[in-house]
Regions:
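Transmembrane alpha-helical insertion/packing segments
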Residues: 29-94, 100-129
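Loop-to-transmembrane boundary segments
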Residues: 33-42, 217-240
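Juxtamembrane "helix exit" motif at the C-terminal ends of alpha-helical transmembrane segments
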Residues: 56-60, 239-262
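Alpha-helical transmembrane segments
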Residues: 67-73, 173-192, 270-274
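Long, highly hydrophobic alpha-helical transmembrane signal-anchor segments
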Residues: 90, 99, 104, 122-185, ...
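Alpha-helical transmembrane segments and their membrane-interface junctions
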Residues: 119-135, 234-252
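Juxtamembrane inter-helical linkers in multi-pass membrane proteins
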Residues: 197-221, 295-307
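Alpha-helical transmembrane segments and their immediate juxtamembrane interface regions
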Residues: 251-298
Length: 310
């Protein structure tokens, strides 16, 4: 009996040790996940702050008040990004786990801001790089400036009293921004077709990636996703044409004095090209999610046969 009790004690000690080791390893893994998420959120916040401050860094003759305002906006954007990506549960950012979606959008936004900032810098402190960028932008703007094109309609935001230099600056910035948005959408579609997202065999959480979408609001989820996808794609296609028309009808357009501000021109043309492309990509992503759910339902459906189970 003594030997049996000794063996039982050893088994109990072994099981307890394994349980404690398992709990310790789980805590270590949880700590690694938290640190990894925090590091990723910090890197994203720094990149967003750099993107917001990029025009003020590249441009010359920026006033102190403008620098302070831009720094405040950059800090706010960085804090919002850090809080959003460091949180366990989603808040406002959609497709948080869809790497191509947000990365392509950020790359599009950053590239547009950099190229437009280089073009505007070349008007004050020309260099070889700025002259090359402006020449490419001028060529793109001229090639896209045909009747009823988005670039032609973007010039409606300029008042009739604006001189030729201001109209040329708007056309160059609009052409460059619109081309970058088209290339970004093409890159996003290529990544989807190549299978980079969503990957086969990986779980997809609709709530994490679509926090503002309510699956239990009523109706079939697939039909609602397809409907929202069509609406986003339609808005993404129409907004480059509607925004200049709305601005032209609601007011007399931007005053020529405001067009002399490089940062106003940079952020206006960036938003004009980024918002439609972002809606277009959102519609494509939602359509892809709807097709995923439809395929999962088809795979989990019981195949019809001549006999029914008892």
């Amino acid at each position: 009996l003594g030997k049996i009790e000794a063996v039982c004690h050893k088994v109990a000690e072994f099981i307890g040790t394994r349980a404690r080791q398992r709990i310790g390893s789980d805590r270590i893994e949880d700590g690694k996940v938290v640190m990894s998420r925090m590091a990723g959120a910090l890197v994203r916040a720094i990149l967003v702050a750099m993107m917001v401050a990029m025009p003020s860094v590249l441009l010359v003759d920026v006033t102190t008040d403008t620098q302070q305002m831009v720094a405040l906006v950059a800090i706010f954007a960085a804090a919002l990004t850090f809080v959003e990506y460091n949180a366990v549960y989603p808040g406002l950012v959609e497709f948080r786990d869809a790497k191509p979606f947000n990365r392509v959008r950020f790359l599009m936004l950053l590239t547009t801001v950099i190229f437009l900032s280089l073009i505007e810098r070349g008007r004050m402190a020309p260099t070889t790089l700025t002259e090359l960028t402006e020449a490419v932008g001028t060529l793109i703007g001229a090639s896209m400036d045909f009747p009823y094109s988005p670039v032609r309609l973007a010039r409606l935001m300029v008042t009739d009293g604006a001189n030729e230099v201001q109209a040329h600056a708007v056309r160059t910035a609009a052409g460059m921004a619109y081309l970058i948005s088209l290339l970004s959408m093409a890159l996003f579609i290529i990544l989807l077709r190549a299978g980079a997202w969503p990957r086969q065999g990986t779980p997809f959480n609709v709530w994490v990636n679509l926090p503002t979408f309510e699956p239990s609001a009523g109706g079939d989820v697939v039909d609602r996703l397809n409907r929202d996808a069509r609406i986003n794609i339609a808005l993404g296609f129409l907004l480059p044409f509607l925004i200049p028309a709305v601005v032209s009808l609601s007011s007399s357009g931007f005053a020529p004095l405001q067009l002399t501000s490089p940062q106003t021109l940079i952020w206006t043309m960036t938003a004009w090209a980024f918002l439609p492309a972002s809606l277009f990509m959102r519609g494509i992503a939602m359509g892809r999610v709807a097709s995923m759910i439809r395929d999962k339902r088809r795979e989990s459906a019981v195949p019809a046969g001549p006999f029914l189970p008892a």
